[in-house]
Amino acid sequence: FIHRYPVLAASGISGPKLRRGDKQVPEGVYGISFLNPNSRYHVALRVNYPNAFDRRMGVKDGRKDLGGDIMIHGKASSVGCLAIGDAAAEELFVLAAETGIKNIRLVIAPTDFRKNAPPAVDGSQPDWLPQLYTEVAAAMTPYKAPPSGSLLSLIFN
């Protein structure tokens, strides 16, 4: 099933995370690699960024330090992570612990590609961005489109 949470704070603009310190939230299909019950932001779930696609595109572009340590966490502020508030983070943390992190697929996208076209790619974006958005759209396709809003979708398999 899919469970969606409102994102209260995230930094950056539409487009993928490219390097450490760029303040971007990754876009793509990820898993959860670690649960942190002692986060400064209440509780946190670590996103497995960079994934294989991110690493391949980093090699292709000659980028070495892609960054990492991307979290979904409580509170209402963030730089490069996804803040969903304490209550939602706690609920998600428990769901992830009970489901098992190996059974979670996290889709992070600038829009819901089942209802909206991908954002236009300009000259400042990587040439592989359409390929990324095709992969993200394919990950969303099997699931019914939910209501609109700035939301984080987690797919529990």
Question: PLM features: what roles do these ranges have?
Answer:
Residues 1-29:
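Glycine-rich catalytic cores of cysteine/serine-nucleophile enzymes that process amide/ester linkages
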